[in-house]
Structure formats: C-alpha cells, structure tokens
C-alpha cells in the first residue's frame, strides 16, 4: 500500500 511504501526504506 502507498501508506506503507515509505516503510520499505
């Protein structure tokens, strides 16, 4: 999800 996409970093 786009909301969690930043968490992949």
UniProtKB/Swiss-Prot annotation:
Q: Which UniProt keywords apply?
A: Amidation, Neuropeptide, Secreted
Q: Where in the cell is it found?
A: Secreted
| N-terminal signal peptide | none
Q: Which residues carry this modification: Phenylalanine amide?
A: 9
Q: What is this protein called?
A: CalliFMRFamide-2
Q: What does this protein do?
A: Able to induce fluid secretion from the isolated salivary gland of Calliphora.
Family in the record:
Belongs to the FARP (FMRFamide related peptide) family.
Q: Which GO terms describe its biological process?
A: neuropeptide signaling pathway
Entry GO terms, CC: extracellular region
């Amino acid at each position: 999800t786009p909301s969690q996409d930043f968490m992949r970093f």
